[in-house]
Amino acid sequence: MKQSTVFTLLLLLIGMAAYSFGWVQAVAEAAAQYVQMINNDAVRLGLLACTAALLMLPAFLYLHYVTQSVKNMTAAFQKLTQSHQSCCDFQQHNLCSRYAEDVKSLRDSYKNVRQTYVMAAVLCQVIIFGCMFEIVKAVPFRLHTPPAFSMGLAMLLILYLLFCMRTYLRQLFRHGSLFRKVFAGALAAAGIWWMLSFSISELLFLIILAAIQQIGSFIYKRFSYHSTASLDL
């Protein structure tokens, strides 16, 4: 079993144990008592969403770095392959010695992109989000809206999540097996049913958090684009 798989399973078991024994709920209720000192519900939700975004920022930045690194590595590998067209026969797997050295050098330049780090970043985001969501559930908000309004917000959030996952869904329906399609459909149906039961405070927390992350993603992409352009110059 790979080290990344063992690490992932260990973190999942720790998280499940903490949730099953009530440790997460106890911490959330203790934190909710401090949040209740703020009388304004809008300030409460904004503070909780900003706190969640700030705690998730290191993992958020690393995952963006990984995404950009994968794109750069793919482009660099294509250029490397084109530069060896004259000395290598890729169809017959007749490769020159310098090609292997260039590929190794390319991989070494992106050695910070590791599956273990990626899984740790994803799990870190999931754990932080789960804890902050439990705090939102533990805080008694005074927001009251018609059920139709809450349903509309839930549908808006569902459409946003589907839009964010459009690339994965497109690949799944084009190249995925029947089992993966059925499994993904069952998970999506369960997730949609679960989100439709959210309270207005939980929905607003998710929407504010998503807006903060989208703004952060836009700023990061603009900053990385200008940095890359300046390096090219």
Curated annotation (Swiss-Prot):
A GO biological process held by the record: bacteriocin biosynthetic process
Lipid bilayer topology: Multi-pass membrane protein
Gene Ontology CC entries for this record: plasma membrane
Reported induction: Transcription is highly induced by oxygen limitation and is under dual and independent control of Spo0A-AbrB and ResDE.
TM segment ranges: 7-27, 46-66, 116-136, 145-165, 176-198, 203-220
Compartments, record wording: Cell membrane
Keywords: Antibiotic biosynthesis, Bacteriocin biosynthesis, Cell membrane, Membrane, Transmembrane, Transmembrane helix
Methyltransferase listed as a keyword: no
Principal location class: membrane
Functional note: Involved in the production of the bacteriocin subtilosin.
Protein name listed in UniProt: Antilisterial bacteriocin subtilosin biosynthesis protein AlbG
